Amino acid sequence: MGDVTAPGQQPEPIHDVLIIGGGINGCGIAMDAAGRGLTVLLCEQDDLACATSSRSSKLIHGGLRYLEFFQFRLVGKALAEREILLRNAPHIIRPLRFRLPHQPHLRPAWMIRSGLFLYDHLARRKALPGSRSLRLGPDSPLKPHIVRGFEYSDAWVDDARLVVLTARAAASHGARILTRTACIGAERRGDLWQATLEDRRTGRRSTHLSRALVNAAGPWVAELQQSTIHCQVHHPLRLVKGSHVVVPRLYPGEHAYILQNEDDRIVFVIPFENDFSLIGTTDVDYQGDPAAAAISPQETRYLLRVVNAHFRQQLQETDVLWSYAGVRALADDAHGKAQAASRDYTLDLDQPPGLAPMISVLGGKITTYRRLAEEATDQLCGLLQRPSRPWTAGAALPGGDFADPATLAADLHKLYPWLPDTLLRRFCHSYGTLTHELLEGCRSLDDLGRHFGADLYAREVLYLIQREWVLEPEDLLWRRTKLGLRLRPAEVSVLRDYMDIRTRWHAADHN
């Protein structure tokens, strides 16, 4: 069972809160609740961030396109959170400028300027510059007829690491985090919940009592509630799939593009992992198991068609190096198009008189996870009659206790001059000040141990097994890092054999 707890922590016989789901919302609630003194147990049926939370567009943003649907409250709330998250996690969240090529037949310039003015002013903005108009010169990667555009600010995030670092923060406050652990049954016993958990690697089952239950199962929220908890969801849900592709880098520069399309949708093109471009997303109604969600050929062609309509360089399906799809469970607000469905969240409370409460989390954006978690924890503390004060707005995530990324990189270079520049930059952007913990005792590159390919060494593999709930190569290659884009199949096979031994040793040490 993937279980990492704070040093010296003893399991509680009755937890205040059992959280089902190890995505960003579940981990956010675990962090906030544990930090307020509640005893927290979180279970995740797979790896942390294994589904929707690692399959986003990887943006911390207000959502410029939501202004067209008059979702001003959502945009303002998200823009305010953008400022907080940039401050709390500067290692994994960084400013990103977006260029919006002007296509006069799609939206007039006055409409775009008005939207950007609102975007600049719906919430207080300190960390990022405002919007401006652009003239696109002959060096632009866009087609020659696109000569005008606009530029504005948002932020990029390593979404999976955001989840994992939030889980680490929760564990540091006493939360118990169990991965590869499914909730296979839960029922009320008066003012308590009794839940049966199953370790998916060993088949072992255990019973746990809690005073409250949080269903943060993401796209499985309704299935879990109906088939495992045997309660009805009070709000109709809509599953919407968003897909992305990764291609070789389309253009130099650290800015992104937001492309308008004839169907009134937009598509992002975002610099990704130095050598690649991330293109997305789609909005498609989805039915079936969210775990099986994958991009369709039609979605791939759609994304490439939008890009090819704007860029000089033309892409083919053979250029796609990687693709992924995530499914969101949104509260169904009866909008006809999936793109128009609100991304705002709903906290659904179920508490029959005299019985233990349950909160189900519906919808939400990765940008507003901290605010969602704060509101959910406010509810939990009220239900459990625990005095509490919100605290996470001023709390740096693990590794984020520094002000300037450039200064941190320079400091790390002085301390570890033997570290290759590419590896130092990756450690800086992935671990921040936790790099010191990762490299403790290392004096040379040889001290990092076995080399598995790209810039992956045994020292990092062991660190992630011990500190970040890594059990399978996929956890490491696609969520804790994106080195899956760089390691060859033979190298992955060697890594798998090594990790199989090391994870078994680690499990034996913790049993």
PLM ranges: what are they?
Residues M1-V17, D32-R36:
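Extreme N-terminal leader/targeting segments of oxidoreductases
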Residues I20, H208-G218:
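Short hydrophobic core segments
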Residues G22-G23, Q45:
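Glycine-rich Rossmann-fold phosphate-binding loop(s) that bind the pyrophosphate
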Residues A34-S54:
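Glycine-rich FAD pyrophosphate-binding loop
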Residues K58-D139:
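Dinucleotide-binding Rossmann-like beta1-alpha1 core, especially the glycine-rich loop
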Residues F150-T207, R211:
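Helical element adjacent to the flavin cofactor pocket in flavoenzyme catalytic cores
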Residues S153, D159-R161, A169, I229, ...:
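C-terminal catalytic lobe of FAD-dependent flavoproteins
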Residues N215-H230:
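Flavin (primarily FAD) binding-site architecture
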